[in-house]
């Protein structure tokens, strides 16, 4: 059962009001557009001809576009079936929404920040000698995402978000120079209050503290003046992509990253946001399963740069120079663990699907097993093919999904993928105790990932995300062991699921799947 409080209900109501008035304003704009079309009825023939020509041009462009068919096919169907509506929606939504100025800002910031990271070509060469099975993935990340691979980094794995929070609070309280925190959602309640108390103490001790959060992700959790409250406490605070009452399809691109950096020495990432439900303070969907990792050592540099990218690109005017030297200071650290660590970030503003490509590469490289855990399973044909092909090669491919959903319509789409995967040998497990929000993968006791990237369209194509690729290190075995515990708590989906669905449900799920990439 969901646990409600007056404070939580009030914040939800405030968020609903903001969403309502924004949606109302957008609806009025849409009504106005329809009204204008009806007033132009005398030019109907010319409008239909123009729209039809434009529809053909767009369909040809989509057909030749370098993008997965799972993303282009729904648009082609919509444009051909309903030309006026399809063309209008595509021009508003399908062009990936981000204004040219926004893309230019990110490109400018990246051109200043990413070259500050070391190339570490010698480490990559060492990786090819020690773990060639994983080295190709690291090469891909270094060349295409521009995030290098590191050694000399200790990794601690937390199989529960609450354990990660306690460690995080301890490290935050020891910060000497700076604290960077970037999260999709912050809830102004007990869990955040504990963090806020530590941050305020650190500010008073002279530590620079920055907090960056996504407006849509936090809209039902905090008041609108939250950032102002933080500024009054001395905490520098910025909001990513505020919800506005106007057509702006960049609103579809959210900051889903979850990063904490402390003094450039320690970093945290994982699946959890800074809200009570992630730490099982409340139980809206049964037991909440989330995970995280702590990095200490050289690899922290990449998460520092990833944070500064979003922080600086969110400014309307990018500074001519971004001095990061004070945040990338060298310090002597000798890691106790060995292995290869590679933090990385993904952006919807380029043509590189980094998160999906890493997952596909792991499935392709796996020889014995490749396991995933995700809260949502809404994948492209390419991802589906990689998983089923691995299973056909004899690889033990498994995916864990939630037993209790947080979004029932999305859960219905998730379940619609079960049959096509199961019948080709992929094993699907439903974690019965509650909602698994963790986003991880592990293969062959050699490589693993932990981060924010779900196996769904929004994470793989629409959101700003981050992850950490790890190879030949102790944490890979810890993640594997956690998967084994989760399998023991889960129910396996069999082919009987296919016969257990009514024709009406199958039809509904098929339609939702077809247009899932447009959501």
Task: Set out the residue ranges of the language-model regions.
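Thr-Gly-centered strand-to-loop micro-motif
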Residues: 373-374, 401, 431, 450-451
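Extended hydrophobic/aromatic segments used for targeting, binding, or gating
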Residues: 382-385, 389-391, 396-423
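Glycine- and other small-residue-rich loops at beta-strand/loop junctions that grip anionic moieties
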Residues: 184, 375-376, 410
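N-terminal localization/anchoring segments of enzymes in phospholipid and broader phosphate metabolism
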Residues: 1-357, 361, 405, 419-423, ...
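Catalytic-core elements of nucleic-acid end-processing and repair enzymes
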Residues: 439
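Acidic, glycine-rich loop-and-beta core segments that form the ion-binding/anion-interacting portion
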Residues: 333-338, 346, 353-375, 381-392, ...
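Surface segments flanking catalytic/ligand-binding clefts of nucleic-acid enzymes
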Residues: 427
């Amino acid at each position: 059962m969901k646990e409600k409080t007056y404070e939580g209900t009030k914040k939800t109501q405030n968020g609903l009001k903001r969403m309502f008035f924004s949606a109302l304003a957008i609806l009025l704009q849409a009504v106005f557009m329809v009204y204008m079309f009806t007033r132009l009825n005398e030019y109907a023939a010319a409008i239909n001809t123009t729209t039809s020509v434009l529809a053909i041009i767009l369909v040809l462009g989509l057909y030749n576009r370098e993008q997965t068919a799972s993303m282009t096919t729904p648009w082609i169907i919509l444009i051909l079936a309903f030309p006026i509506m399809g063309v209008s929606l595509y021009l508003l939504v399908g062009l990936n929404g981000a204004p040219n100025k926004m893309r230019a800002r990110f490109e400018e910031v990246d051109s200043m920040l990413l070259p500050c990271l070391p190339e570490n070509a010698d480490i990559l060469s060492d990786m090819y000698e020690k773990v060639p099975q994983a080295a190709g993935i690291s090469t891909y990340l270094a060349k295409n995402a521009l995030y290098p691979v590191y050694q000399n980094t200790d990794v601690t794995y937390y199989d529960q978000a609450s354990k990660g929070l306690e460690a995080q609070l301890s490290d935050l309280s020891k910060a000497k120079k700076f604290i960077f925190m970037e999260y999709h959602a912050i809830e102004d309640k007990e869990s955040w209050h504990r963090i806020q108390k530590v941050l305020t103490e650190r500010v008073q001790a002279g530590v620079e503290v920055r907090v960056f959060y996504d407006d849509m992700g936090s809209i039902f959790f905090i008041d609108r003046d939250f950032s102002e409250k933080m500024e009054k406490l001395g905490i520098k605070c910025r909001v990513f992509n505020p919800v506005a009452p106007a057509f702006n399809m960049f609103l579809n691109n959210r900051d889903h990253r979850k990063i904490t950096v402390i003094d450039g020495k320690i970093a945290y990432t994982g699946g959890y946001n800074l809200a009570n439900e992630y730490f099982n303070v409340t139980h809206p969907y049964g037991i909440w399963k989330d995970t995280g990792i702590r990095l200490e050592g050289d690899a922290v540099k990449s998460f520092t740069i990833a944070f500064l990218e979003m922080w600086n690109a969110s400014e309307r005017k990018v500074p001519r120079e971004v001095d990061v030297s004070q945040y990338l200071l060298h310090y002597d650290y000798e890691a106790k663990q060995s292995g290869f660590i590679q933090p990385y970030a993904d952006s919807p503003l380029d043509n590189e699907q980094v998160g999906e490509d890493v997952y596909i590469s792991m499935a392709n490289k796996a020889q014995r097993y490749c396991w995933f855990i995700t809260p949502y399973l809404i994948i492209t044909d390419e991802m589906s093919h990689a998983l089923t092909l691995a299973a056909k090669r004899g690889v033990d491919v498994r995916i864990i999904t939630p037993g209790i959903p947080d979004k029932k319509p999305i859960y219905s789409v998730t379940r619609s993928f079960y049959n096509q995967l199961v019948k080709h040998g992929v094993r699907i497990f439903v974690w019965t105790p509650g909602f698994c929000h963790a986003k991880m993968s592990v293969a062959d006791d050699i490589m693993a990932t932990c981060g924010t990237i779900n196996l769904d369209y929004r994470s793989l194509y629409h959101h700003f995300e981050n992850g950490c690729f790890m190879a030949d290190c102790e944490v890979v075995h810890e993640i594997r062991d956690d998967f084994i515990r989760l399998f023991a708590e889960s129910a396996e989906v069999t082919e009987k699921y296919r016969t257990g669905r009514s024709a009406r449900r199958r039809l509904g799920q098929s339609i939702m799947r077809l247009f899932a990439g447009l959501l």
